[in-house]
Each structure stands twice: as structure tokens, then as C-alpha cells.
Amino acid sequence: MKENDMNNGVDKWVNEEDGRNDHHNNNNNLMKKAMMNNEQIDRTQDIDNAKEMLRKISSESSSRRSSLLNKDSSLVNGNANSGGGTSINGTRGSSKSSNTHFQYASTAYGVRMLSKDISNTKVELDVENLMIVTKLNDVSLYFLTRELVEWVLVHFPRVTVYVDSELKNSKKFAAGELCEDSKCRESRIKYWTKDFIREHDVFFDLVVTLGGDGTVLFVSSIFQRHVPPVMSFSLGSLGFLTNFKFEHFREDLPRIMNHKIKTNLRLRLECTIYRRHRPEVDPNTGKKICVVEKLSTHHILNEVTIDRGPSPFLSMLELYGDGSLMTVAQADGLIAATPTGSTAYSLSAGGSLVCPTVNAIALTPICPHALSFRPIILPESINLKVKVSMKSRAPAWAAFDGKDRIELQKGDFITICASPYAFPTVEASPDEFINSISRQLNWNVREQQKSFTHILSQKNQEKYAHEANKVRNQAEPLEVIRDKYSLEADATKENNNGSDDESDDESVNCEACKLKPSSVPKPSQARFSV
């Protein structure tokens, strides 16, 4: 019933949007208001669906819970009849408190199991509208895009390919010639724009990127609400987010489009900027009223950075968590990063690596004045607020995934929380995160220690072996050396009568090798390997 209501709501929203597009200029404000209302409805429906799934999980274990509660009640009643003790609240035989706590613990366990099931769920894609995002400042990728589009048009007749509108008049891409070569209609090649994506974010079934990590971040910036699954081919300078090789696209694309796939729902952060205006005086009460204006909201995949910008002074930033003041940071800035962004700016500033499947917020200071201000990992449920202190000497600057840089005056603040719109990426392999940090960062890569004899010439190796055998033959067994050392040391101690003298010699004469105890070959010295 709820799924039908949600589908009807989506269809209604699409129809309303299509009707408004014809009168966009006249009804712009009305459309924005409707989109905000529908966004709130979508969030409510998502929460209701999650609650319904939790109810199903709880109902599956209701019989087991009832049996345990009945058993506990019988034990409590038995103790009460035999003159046993009372419960915590002073009443005999009451299991209300334990029942409530048991339900609470069961719900928490159900949430963890639900999260685990979602992370392991495989989704079957019915791809009809394929979107291709190309790194436009690399000319060589124009031809690779052409090759990919031609192959898809030939092998997937039901698929309509959408490419960047910048390629429409490109001679390198040559859409008309491409349709002739693939023997398909020109209507199967269409072009997407940012405005089209903002209005139809659920239109595409799969996004394929040709570029590097910056191309993936660009996809996140244009899909500010729902994001289709993203399959990224590594054709850039970095490769933390691009785990597919382009030379294997003929094998990987059919597997993704024809079979069930596993996606990683990467956490994004919802960042909202608020501008503080000068306080106004209420004419009735005479009190000052602080006016705050909401400027914009960004859903980011990597990090939000609040720094001092061109100012030579340190930033003074007040950090709040769930409404409580956590600390006042005097530093070059602060970084609030997602697990995906933990390998970017946050890592360079000394932050920790975080697996993308862990939902958390990595807070990393940039060159803090206090060395005790260390990076910290916070839960995704926390609501952060970073405010430019009124005592700050200069304004601050904020950037979202390195873009949309904006100046923050004294009193301005940014709220940071987990975004309801995750960023799904197609999983190439279960260990792709470890492979990426090992490949890009040389994580825990070290040279194996080599044997000393490997760098010796043949002549010196023979001399070394001869000397090793000579020392081995002269050395007495370790047990004999220990006995001699202990006996002679006791004799020397008796002769000294417990007094220290400059003439005392702590060395022990060894009849076999005439060496001091410190020169007696140790087991590691006596057993040579050539």
C-alpha cells in the first residue's frame, strides 16, 4: 500500500513538473515551492518504509521474545512466592522495565541487521537510459566516448545513450557519422544538461564516467538529490573512485547491465550556509532580534572545508555538536569529510583513513594552534555547526568538494549532517578499497630485507664462509661457556670480598678463545648462513 502511494506520489510529481516546464518563466516560484514540499514528502516516505522494515524484523522474533519474557515472568513469580527479593522499581514480579529494555535492544539489533542486509543486497538494473559523463578537457576521451557509445548502440538495442551537450557539435565525436556506422536511429543518441538533471534526477538508470576522481565528484555535484548507480572507468590521474579499467568495458558492461550488481551506498554530507544579519530592535519589547538567512544547501561526496582564505590570521571557529559547544578551534581551518573523502584533503591534513562502508564524519583540523587538537571520527547521527566566532580577526571561506567557494563573515555558520541522498557506486570487487589505497598510497608497502651475502662478490663470499667456519670451530658449546662464566665469576667475587677496586677486572678468561665475555659468540653470531 505504501509503495503504491509512493509511486503515485512520484508520478504526480513528474506530471506536475512536466506541466510546469511549459510555463517555467511565469511559475518559477511555484515550482520551487512544490519541489520543496515533494522533497519533504519523499523523506517522510523513506522514513516510513524503514520503520515498516523494522517492524517486520521485530515481528519475526516476536515468538522468541515472548517465550523469553514468559520464562522471566515465571522465574520472578517463583521468587516472589518463595519470599524472594523485589524488582528495581520496588514491585514484585514486574518485568515492564526489562521488557522495554529488551525491545529497545532488539530494535537496535534489527537496525544493524537491516543495515547489513542493505549493504549486501544486489540490485538488478533494467537499463533503458544510459548517461555517459566524459572529462571534456581531455581530447583523447572524445574518441573513447565515441567507441563506447557505438558499442552500446550495437549490442543493446533498447538502450538510449545520453552524452554531454558539449559533444553535440563536436567533430571529434561526430554523432551523425556514429549513427551511420552503428546503423541506428539518431534519436538513440541524446544530450543531457545540468538543468535537465536537476528536474529529472530519477530519469537515468545508470551513469558511466570516463575520467578520474574529479569526474565522479562532478557527477555528485549535478545530482544533488537522487543519484543513479555510477560505474567509473579509470582514465584520470587518480583512481580512488574509479575501479574499472576501460580496456575491459566489453566484459564489464554486459555483466553490470544484465546481472544483479552490488553497489556501495557512499555517505554524503548535507551542508547548509546561513548568513547572519545585523540584529533588529523589536519596537514592542525593545529587545534585539537576530535575523539569520538561509543561503544555499550542498550535498557533497568528499569534504567541506572552512579555512582562513587569503587572510594572514588564524581562523577562530566555534564547533557545535547537537547544539552543544564542543570546542573553539584556532587553526588555518577545519575539514569535515566523508569516509570517501578521507583519502583526499583530510588525509593530507593528518586525518585517518576510513572505509567507505563506515557511516561516519571525519573531523580534521588544518594546522591547529594547539597540538592537542587531533583528528576525530564522529558518528553520522551527529548534527554539526561550524560558526565564525564574533571574536575572529578575519572572515573565513568555505568550499564544498573544492567548488562553490563562499566567504563567511563573523556570525555566519554552516550546518553539517548526513545527507539523505547517498551516492551509489558499482562495486568492482569486494576488496576495492584496500586495492585502491595500496595502489595509490602504497599503503604498508616496504622493501623486504635482503641477506648481507647477496651484495658480496664470489671471492668475498668464499672468504666470508671461511671465516665463519673458523669462528664456528673455535667456539665452545653455549652450555660450556655459560658454566665457565658463572664459576669464574663466583671465584672472582670471593677474591674481591665484596669490595670494588680499580684493579678489578670483570673479564673472564676463556681457555678456548681467550676472549672477554662480551666477545663470546652469541647464538646468532655462531650460526652463519651463506
From Swiss-Prot:
EC number from the UniProt entry: 2.7.1.23
Record's keyword annotation contains NADP: yes
Lineage, top ranks: Eukaryota, Fungi, Dikarya, Ascomycota, Saccharomycotina
Note: Present with 5040 molecules/cell in log phase SD medium.
BP terms from Gene Ontology: intracellular iron ion homeostasis; NAD metabolic process; NADP biosynthetic process
Protein name (database record): NAD(+) kinase
Disordered: region residues: 1-27, 57-99, 486-530
Residues that bear Phosphoserine: 499, 503
Biased composition (Polar residues): 88-99
Gene Ontology MF terms: ATP binding; NAD+ kinase activity; NADH kinase activity
Organism: Saccharomyces cerevisiae (strain ATCC 204508 / S288c)
Reactions listed under catalytic activity: NAD(+) + ATP = ADP + NADP(+) + H(+)
pH dependence: Optimum pH is 8.0.
One Gene Ontology term, aspect cellular component: cytoplasm
Family as reported in the entry's similarity comment: Belongs to the NAD kinase family.
Gene3D superfamilies assigned: Probable inorganic polyphosphate/atp-NAD kinase, domain 1, Probable inorganic polyphosphate/atp-NAD kinase, domain 2
InterPro entries: ATP-NAD_kinase_N (IPR017438), ATP-NAD_kinase_PpnK-typ_C (IPR017437), NAD/diacylglycerol_kinase_sf (IPR016064), NADK (IPR002504)
Membrane spanning stretches: none
